[in-house]
A protein has these predicted regions:
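PLP-dependent aminotransferase class I/II
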Residues: 198-281
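Conserved PLP-anchoring active-site segment centered on the Schiff-base-forming lysine
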Residues: 100-123, 128-130, 134-135
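Conserved PLP-binding catalytic core of the aspartate aminotransferase-like
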Residues: 264, 274-306, 324
Length: 339
């Protein structure tokens, strides 16, 4: 078969490890008890109570008014200037993939270590990508990517630092991409109210609302950039059920405030449990905690043998990331291994 029309190479793409891969763990630890307790992601274990969805949402194409309602709800929840600044998408990951393809090839600095899909997406789109350890190391990059709060260590930058960086990049025709996937429940100041030609913000829905399978995420950008991104995604990018559920959830500020309080208490409880096990918490958010252990690989295997999945890091074998258990049974299972 002649593959000359294809732009991709024949080599297999390199796989990026993610949390939530229970299939691989079941194969590696076939004697582990079921059901597995999945603490390998940073997804809220107590999901938003899904409201009833009209049957027609499953059977007809989404309407423009429904998309606009979601945009307005998202703008209010995130503090964006208007619904015209909001780009709904079937998950933030597709936005991470789409944005690099809209820009001419340039130098990209990714503040790392962080979520690996950012560097991978910019590289696939033909940009020259470097992972840098600090804002001082970005040099003359045309695009800078920061995850704030960062995954996996929870690192944050002040709003002044982030706004200053966006302004600097804008003056030279560049762009700051601020991934605020874990910002909803944290006491951080979002950049969403300040988007302009040099700033695009990404927001995740599934992590905060515990509905990752719904596939919903947002870009917040000035209206011209937002329109280009929406055009790149194509029509009906978000399903009817996701539009309905997302609009209801984003409009529920009381649930969001109570969830922030409850998950912060859970994170503090997890920190105490990790400390009793000899771990040193190095950071995180209220949806996950990252810690170093004297024998990280050994603890990882011990947890897996007990049917508990946590996130490990090839480059830092002493480091593990823990999500939050969903209920009393989950907390007890984790406690038995860590004590």
């Amino acid at each position: 078969m002649d593959h000359s029309v294809w732009r991709f190479s024949a080599r297999e793409p390199a796989a990026i490890a993610h949390g939530g891969d229970l299939g691989s763990l079941r194969r590696a630890f076939p004697d582990a008890p079921n059901p597995w307790l999945d603490l390998s992601t940073g997804i809220n274990p107590i999901p938003y109570p899904v409201p009833p969805v009209e049957a027609s949402a499953w059977t007809r194409l989404p309407e423009a008014a429904e998309v606009q309602a979601l945009r307005v709800a998202a703008a209010s929840a995130y503090g964006a200037p208007s619904g015209a600044h909001i780009v709904p998408a079937p998950g933030t990951q597709i936005l991470i993939e789409t944005l690099p393809r809209l820009l001419a090839p340039t130098r990209v600095a990714v503040l790392g270590p962080t979520y690996a899909e950012h560097a991978a997406a910019w590289t696939r789109a033909g940009h020259a990508v470097a992972e840098v350890p600090s804002l001082d190391a970005i040099g003359d990059a045309g695009v800078v990517v920061i995850v704030d709060p960062n995954n996996p260590d929870g690192r944050t930058f002040s709003r002044a630092e982030r706004r200053g960086l966006a302004a600097t990049l804008e003056t030279r025709g560049g762009l700051l991409v601020a991934d605020e996937a874990f910002a909803d429940l944290e006491p951080v100041e979002s950049l969403c109210p300040h988007v302009g030609p040099g700033l695009v913000v990404l927001r995740s829905f599934g992590k905060t609302y515990g509905l990752a399978g719904l596939r919903l995420g947002f870009a917040v950008a000035e209206p011209g950039i937002a329109a280009r991104m929406a055009e790149a995604l194509g029509p009906w990018a978000v399903s009817g059920p996701a539009l309905a559920i997302g609009t209801a959830a984003l409009s529920d500020s009381a649930w969001r405030a109570e969830t922030a309080r409850a998950r912060a208490a859970d994170a503090a409880r997890l920190d105490r449990m990790i400390a009793r096990a000899g771990g040193r918490v190095v950071g995180g958010t209220c949806l996950f905690r990252t810690a170093d252990f004297s024998d990280g690989p050994g603890l990882y295997r011990l947890l897996a043998a007990a049917g508990i999945a946590v996130r490990r890091f090839t480059e830092r074998p002493d480091r593990l990331r823990f999500g939050l258990p969903p209920d009393r049974t989950g907390w007890c299972r984790l406690s038995r291994v860590l004590t």
